Amino acid sequence: MQKQNSFTFEELLSCGRGEMFGEGNAQLPLPPMLMFDRIVSITEEGGQYGNGQIVAELDVRPDLWFFNCHFAGDPVMPGCLGLDAMWQLVGFYLGWMGGKGRGRALGAGDVKFTGQVLPTGKLITYRIDLKRVIMRKLVMGIADAHMEIDGREIYVASDLRVGLFTRTDNF
């Protein structure tokens, strides 16, 4: 049976409610912290390293929650939200691959911001290239990620790490 290779906003909400991968397993945050509207493509192979890739998108609207508070009179998307979206996507990938446990961001190598998302932007595109996927007792993904606004790359993160944990009380 072939895995589903794209996901609508409604399906992402189902994942956020814990309905997609089963109770206690990988789960996306719900809005407003869910930082993408759809997964355009997700593959086990391909991408820069041949170990899988995710492409997701967020439609930029002037009424997005963060523009009203970051900053008054100078609205800009916080860079940490774009970075969090990248971690969210790596965690989703691990659940999609059948990994068990709750997702936790474990770190990143270099993170670079070379641009900004303003309310006048139209489309954010995230591209996550899996470097390594470990599916043993330890479930972990290591990926490089790129974020574009309207086709222009503005964020790059290397060696993003996300793990799935069956116990988080001692984390």
From Swiss-Prot:
GO terms for cellular component: cytoplasm. The active site is at H70. It comes from the Bacteria. Keywords: Cytoplasm, Fatty acid biosynthesis, Fatty acid metabolism, Isomerase, Lipid biosynthesis, Lipid metabolism, Lyase. It is found in: Cytoplasm. Disulfide bonds: none annotated. Pfam families: FabA. InterPro entries: FabA, FabA_FabZ, HotDog_dom_sf. GO terms for molecular function: (3R)-hydroxyacyl-[acyl-carrier-protein] dehydratase activity; trans-2-decenoyl-acyl-carrier-protein isomerase activity. It catalyses: a (3R)-hydroxyacyl-[ACP] = a (2E)-enoyl-[ACP] + H2O; (3R)-hydroxydecanoyl-[ACP] = (2E)-decenoyl-[ACP] + H2O; (2E)-decenoyl-[ACP] = (3Z)-decenoyl-[ACP]. Its EC number is 4.2.1.59, 5.3.3.14. The keyword Secreted does not apply. One of its GO terms (biological process) is unsaturated fatty acid biosynthetic process. Its main location: cytoplasm. Pathway: Lipid metabolism; fatty acid biosynthesis. Necessary for the introduction of cis unsaturation into fatty acids. Catalyzes the dehydration of (3R)-3-hydroxydecanoyl-ACP to E-(2)-decenoyl-ACP and then its isomerization to Z-(3)-decenoyl-ACP. Can catalyze the dehydratase reaction for beta-hydroxyacyl-ACPs with saturated chain lengths up to 16:0, being most active on intermediate chain length. Homodimer. Belongs to the thioester dehydratase family. FabA subfamily. This is 3-hydroxydecanoyl-[acyl-carrier-protein] dehydratase. It comes from Methylobacillus flagellatus (strain ATCC 51484 / DSM 6875 / VKM B-1610 / KT). The gene is fabA.
